[in-house]
Amino acid sequence: MKNTILLLFTAFIFLMGFFGMSADALADPKADPLAGPFPDADPDPINMKAVAAVAKKPLG
């Protein structure tokens, strides 16, 4: 019984990490779920066209 509870708790923690749920998100359910943990970290979006162009160069 004790091992089953420990296994279920470990699986729950693993799934929270796998799906990106943090303790802050669980503590504040009204927070924006799409906002990252550091919204001011990178104000410029990634230019996917430039990334694709750089990736195509070595591939031909």
From Swiss-Prot:
Secretion signal, residue range per the UniProt entry: 1-27
GO CC terms in record: extracellular region; membrane; other organism cell membrane
AXPX repeat coordinates: 27-30, 31-34, 35-38, 41-44
BP GO annotations: defense response to bacterium; defense response to fungus; innate immune response; killing of cells of another organism
Claim: Glycoprotein is one of the keywords in the record: no
Protein's cellular compartments: Secreted; Target cell membrane
Keywords, comma-separated and alphabetical: Amidation, Antibiotic, Antimicrobial, Fungicide, G-protein coupled receptor impairing toxin, Immunity, Innate immunity, Mast cell degranulation, Membrane, Repeat, Secreted, Signal, Target cell membrane, Target membrane, Toxin
Entry keyword rRNA-binding: no
Modified residues (Leucine amide): L59
Tissue occurrence: Expressed by the venom gland.
Positions of the pro-segment in this chain: 28-45
Molecular function terms, GO-annotated: toxin activity
Family affiliation: Belongs to the MCD family. Mastoparan subfamily.
The protein's role, per its UniProt record: Antimicrobial peptide. Shows activity against both Gram-positive and -negative bacteria, as well against fungi. Also promotes moderate mast cell degranulation. Does not show hemolytic activity on rabbit and human erythrocytes. Its mast cell degranulation activity may be related to the activation of G-protein coupled receptors in mast cells as well as interaction with other proteins located in cell endosomal membranes in the mast cells.
Name of the molecule in the record: Mastoparan-VB2
Species, as recorded: Vespa bicolor
